């Protein structure tokens, strides 16, 4: 059974909060660049992606990183690949 988008979004936010607990997830705009809204360095970003890998069982190749700029893009990406 596919995972619904609200569950994916919740999982993405939980992965983000594990790295940056100070983030106000209620204030995030799904369409804005995530890095403009959250102070993440490159190592933090890799840890968020690792959290997504662990949570959803998906591999995220480095060539796809540019496709994951907004919260909506991340949710869409995970929805396409999650099992």
Region spans (language model):
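C-terminal structural segments of small proteins and small subunits
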Residues: 66, 72-81
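Phosphopantetheine carrier-protein modules
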Residues: 19-39, 55-67
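Thiotemplate assembly-line natural product biosynthesis machinery
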Residues: 2-25, 81-82
